[in-house]
Regions:
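Short beta-strands and strand-loop turn motifs
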Residues: 7, 38-42, 121-123, 160-165, ...
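N-terminal glycine-rich anion-binding loops that anchor highly charged ligand groups
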Residues: 1-2, 29-41
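Active-site-adjacent loop and "lid" segments of alpha/beta metabolic enzymes
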Residues: 11-29, 45-69, 73, 83-84, ...
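Short acidic capping loops at alpha-helix termini that bridge into adjacent secondary structure
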Residues: 155-159
C-alpha cells in the first residue's frame, strides 16, 4: 500500500502533494513502482495534529479522487476517520476505507455495510496514550470491534486489522508489538502494518523522518515473514524489493 498525503502538514512529505495534478502524478508513480493499492489521506494524523473540518478534508480529497477515477488509476484507499468522508469517497469509486480511529465515528459501520468495500480497522483506544501495551489487550479490543462490524453486516473477510504503530502506545512498545504480531492472526482478519518512516525507527536510524526508507524496508521485510498481508509505506519500490527477498526466504524454508 503506497502512501499519498494531500495534506499541508504531513510529518514526512511536507505538503509536497497538495496540488491535485501533482498528487495524481504521484499516485501513478506509486502504482508504477509496484503498489497494489494507494492510500490517500486528506487529514494529517501525525502526533499533535490539528483536526480539520469535514469540508476542508473533502476539498483536498475530491479533485484527486475524481481525477484518479477518470484516468482509471486504482485501486484507491482513503485514509479518514469520518463516516461522511468515507461515504463520499466510496461514491467516487474508492475500494478501501482506512480508519485510524478504530470505529470512533458511530456512523462508520453503517457506511461500510451499505457498500462492498474493504476496511482497515486500527487499534486505537480513545483517551490518554500509555507507554506500554499488551498484545492480549490489543487482541481483545480488536475482537470487540470486529464483533461490532459483524453485527452491522460487515464480514471479517473485508477487514484488515492494524496494530497502530506510532499511535496508541509509547515509542519503545512498537518493537514489542512487532515481535508479537503473529498472535493477532487468530482474529481471522487480514493484517496491515504501517511502519513507514515512523518515530520508533529513529531508535535505529540517524536519518530525518523523510529519509527513513532503508529502515522502513528492513522492518517491512521482517513483517512479511510474520504473516503480515499489507505494509503501508512511502517508498514502494524499495520496500517491494525488500519484501520480495523475505518472501523467497519464507518459501525456501517451507520447501525445506
Amino acid at each position: 500500500m503506497g502512501i499519498l498525503n494531500v495534506t499541508p502538514d504531513s510529518f514526512s512529505d511536507s505538503g509536497r502533494y497538495t496540488a491535485p495534478d501533482i498528487a495524481v502524478a504521484q499516485a501513478e508513480k506509486l502504482f508504477a513502482d509496484g503498489a497494489d493499492i494507494v492510500d490517500i489521506g486528506g487529514e494529517s494524523t501525525r502526533p499533535g495534529y490539528v483536526p480539520v473540518t469535514l469540508d476542508e478534508e473533502w476539498d483536498r480529497l475530491r479533485p484527486v479522487l475524481t481525477a484518479c477515477a477518470r484516468k482509471g488509476i486504482g485501486p484507491i484507499s482513503v485514509d479518514t476517520q469520518k463516516a461522511e468522508i468515507a461515504r463520499r469517497a466510496l461514491d467516487e469509486g474508492t475500494s478501501v476505507i482506512n480508519d485510524v480511529s478504530g470505529l470512533a465515528d458511530p456512523q462508520m459501520a453503517k457506511v461500510l455495510q451499505a457498500s462492498l468495500c474493504g476496511y482497515v480497522l486500527m487499534y486505537h483506544p480513545q483517551g490518554a496514550v500509555g507507554e506500554t501495551v499488551s498484545i492480549e489487550g490489543m487482541y481483545r479490543w480488536l475482537k470487540t470491534r470486529l464483533s461490532q462490524l459483524s453485527q452491522a453486516g460487515v464480514e471479517v473477510e473485508r477487514v484488515l486489522i492494524d496494530p497502530g504503530l506510532g499511535f496508541a502506545y509509547g515509542v519503545e512498545a512498537n518493537w514489542a508489538v512487532i515481535a508479537e504480531l503473529p498472535a493477532l492472526l487468530g482474529l481471522g482478519a487480514g493484517l496491515l502494518v504501517g511502519p513507514s518512516r515512523k518515530r520508533f525507527l529513529a531508535m535505529v536510524s540517524t536519518q530525518p523522518a523523510s529519509e527513513r526508507d532503508a529502515a522502513t524496508a528492513a522492518i517491512s521485510a521482517l513483517l512479511a515473514t510474520q504473516g503480515v498481508d499489507v505494509v503501508r509505506v512511502h517508498h514502494v519500490a524499495m520496500v517491494k524489493e525488500a519484501v520480495a527477498v523475505a518472501d523467497r526466504l519464507v518459501e525456501a524454508a517451507h520447501r525445506g
